[in-house]
Amino acid sequence: MNSKIKVDKFVIVAFLLCMVCTMAMQAKAYDNFKVSVYVRAYEVDKMKDIHWLDSTWNVISQQLEVDKIYLETHRDLLIVDDATLEQAKKFFHDRGIETAGGITYTINEANSFETFCYSNPEHREMVRKIAEHTAKHFDEFILDDFFFTSCKSDIEIKAKGAQSWTEYRLKLMTEAGRDLVLKPAKKVNPRVKVIIKYPNWYDHFQGLGFNLEEGPQLFDGVWTGTETRDPAGNQHLQNYLSYNIIRYFDNRRPGYNGGGWVDSGGLKLGMDRYAEQLHLTMLAKAPEIILFAYNQLLGVKLSPRFRTPWQGMGTSFNYDEMTAPIRQKDGTSIEPTTMARIADVVLKQTDKLIGKLVNPIGIKSYKPFHVAGDDFLQNYLGMIGLPMDIRPVFPKDQQVV
């Protein structure tokens, strides 16, 4: 009897220790949202070398607390093999990090963002196989915002017929999403959740086939590109878009907008331009932020050139404080080396504020599907201090629209 009691006690103690370890591994780094990192297929492919994976992850994780990793399976015709994907998944799971998949449907991004031709039978077969390959490894994956087509091959010209390019591409990409991505993926893995990321060009979605009328209802969720980068760049995006476009997709299909997405674009304006994009994304109450990408968080080194002239004048972004030594949990300190440190400090600042805020409100602004003209008007209104709230359906219950 005594031996049985001892065994039972041992089992209980072991169980409790496992529970404590699990809770510790699953402890949230942030109270009000998740922070995730997207890894391009180029870097995922390098993760076949476990030493490279471990050493690079140490650089990032010592500076930035991460809840989730998106492992891309395809980009520019590079398909990451099964063994590498499983090794990478296990590596992150062992460290308490969630994993999901990602796909970028490009043939050659460097060649003017060359995409697939979705009426070409060979291309269609590749698109289908990539979706199946990804669904085999993940219960969730996201399509990076290259799920569009700019192809004008002979096949596409013939298939278009008398339609305009916009009409043709809207129908084509809706069909491709349904028949080449969703159906094949769910046949391989009925549990899989497929999310489409929409880019930051909301006034021009329709021209290359992003169908805002049907797409958000077709996919299991949407993601929002909140990258505003340099306002003087070729897109001429105003800073307010990082907030405004989150609200637009929240209103398009409430409860299905997974979050925002920011990269390192615009750093020539200073590191606080990056910080502002993070702040504005989260102030829109995004439930998750994806930081693009692993290679940038690893490779963009902290430098005095990112310190703007107005530092030291009482601004909320203090470059010197953010680049000070980081105290680790074991009491040691390390010198921050990359932009991962900036993301960590900024997001933790924002996290403290977000919990005190209610849901955003603003002046309702009606934007019908597939319209052109008055490019990004709502962003300009936001920049002069008017709180905007874009709606895809006319808000009949409002006195002011």
Regions found by a protein language model. Give the residues of each.
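Active-site-adjacent "subsite" loops/lids of carbohydrate-active enzymes
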Residues: 30-54, 85-93, 98-139, 145, ...
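Bacterial Sec-dependent signal peptides at the C-terminal "C-region" and cleavage site
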Residues: 21-31
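Short, acidic/polar
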Residues: 45-63, 120-134, 204-215, 270-281
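Bacterial N-terminal signal peptides
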Residues: 11-22
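A short, well-structured beta->alpha microelement
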Residues: 50-58, 377-399
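Hydrophobic targeting/anchoring helices
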Residues: 38, 67, 111-115, 139, ...
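Bacterial N-terminal signal peptides that target proteins for export
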Residues: 2-13
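Surface-exposed amphipathic alpha-helices with a cationic face
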Residues: 31, 86-100, 177-192, 246-257
